[in-house]
């Protein structure tokens, strides 16, 4: 079955790098396709292709059982100790691996692949720093969080990306995923999985969104991670 995604070809051939971006709850791949246009303005990203996967529709308990695009279920927004859809997260981590393998099969080296996401997609990205069987070029998490416990990841941990750079940007006025959830995620992955290159940046006045300042920092991170 073909992998469902919005795909943006590299401006120049052949493609040498790939940036995979997983969207947030209720969104779609097209919601983040602006990132390709933004980055491809720079000649440095001419040989970079972009893939923006689309999540399937599923019932979200925290939204009254409404069906919407999601990578995993959310049971309760307000309670950080609420039930976590561990199996849903693990299932989506397999989807991520399928997208990565697709690019490798097409001749892209793993170290030239960047995995990133926003909100739910960022949560998957952070989990992938531990579970990915591939040594990637970098990870970026925008407004990300982690509600998994160490034991949830232990059984599927690969630990191939302990030294891989991670960029985590978060707004200090985020009403959906409070910035504390973001800083807690950094502590979690550094303490239990010994990530050694985890850069967490907060953005003053930013809500559950992105900003020009964050985008500029992301460009700098991607350029360094891909050696552009």
From Swiss-Prot:
GO terms for molecular function: carboxylic ester hydrolase activity; palmitoyl-(protein) hydrolase activity. The keyword Nucleus applies. Gene3D superfamilies: alpha/beta hydrolase. InterPro entries: AB_hydrolase_fold (IPR029058), LYPA1-2/EST-like (IPR050565), PLipase/COase/thioEstase (IPR003140). Its EC number is 3.1.2.-, 3.1.2.22. One of its GO terms (biological process) is fatty acid metabolic process. It catalyses: S-hexadecanoyl-L-cysteinyl-[protein] + H2O = L-cysteinyl-[protein] + hexadecanoate + H(+). Coiled coil: none annotated. Transmembrane segments: none annotated. The active site is at residues 119, 174, 208. GO terms for cellular component: cytoplasm; nucleus. Its main location: cytoplasm. It is found in: Cytoplasm; Nucleus. Hydrolyzes fatty acids from S-acylated cysteine residues in proteins with a strong preference for palmitoylated G-alpha proteins over other acyl substrates. Mediates the deacylation of G-alpha proteins such as GPA1 in vivo, but has weak or no activity toward palmitoylated Ras proteins. Has weak lysophospholipase activity in vitro; however such activity may not exist in vivo. This is Acyl-protein thioesterase 1. The lineage of its organism: Eukaryota, Fungi, Dikarya, Ascomycota, Saccharomycotina.
């Amino acid at each position: 079955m073909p992998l469902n995604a919005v795909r943006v070809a590299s401006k120049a051939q052949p493609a040498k790098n790939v940036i995979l971006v997983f969207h947030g709850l209720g969104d779609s791949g097209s919601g983040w396709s602006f990132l390709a246009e933004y980055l491809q303005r720079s000649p440095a990203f001419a040989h970079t292709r972009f893939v923006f996967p689309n999540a399937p529709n599923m019932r979200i308990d925290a939204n009254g059982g409404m069906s919407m695009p999601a990578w995993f279920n959310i049971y309760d927004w307000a309670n950080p100790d609420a039930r976590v859809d561990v199996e849903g997260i693990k299932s989506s981590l397999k989807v991520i691996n399928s997208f990565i393998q697709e690019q490798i099969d097409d001749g892209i080296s793993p170290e030239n692949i960047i995995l990133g996401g926003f909100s739910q997609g960022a949560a998957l990205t952070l989990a992938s720093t531990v579970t990915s069987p591939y040594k990637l070029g970098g990870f970026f998490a925008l407004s990300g969080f982690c509600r998994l416990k160490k034991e949830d990841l232990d059984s599927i941990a690969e630990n191939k990306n302990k030294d891989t750079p991670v960029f985590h940007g978060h707004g200090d006025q985020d009403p959906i995923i409070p910035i504390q959830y973001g800083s807690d995620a950094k502590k979690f992955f550094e303490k239990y999985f010994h990530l050694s290159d985890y850069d967490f940046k907060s953005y003053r006045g930013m809500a559950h969104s992105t900003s020009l300042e964050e985008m500029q920092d992301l460009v700098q991170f991607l350029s360094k991670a891909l050696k552009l």
